[in-house]
């Protein structure tokens, strides 16, 4: 899959904020919501976006040992 500047911007924004809604994402990269959503779905279907995850704070969860 060939990435243009919009695709690259989408990936960059989602790396920093995977919970951003499509409307806000579209505004940040300068697209209207429909084409933005189509691009996100295409990136997901191509496997470039493999998922969305939560990062947990081990200390706040009371976990003192982390095994790798």
Residue ranges and their predicted role:
Residues 1-68:
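A compositional/biophysical signature of low hydrophobicity enriched in polar/charged and small residues
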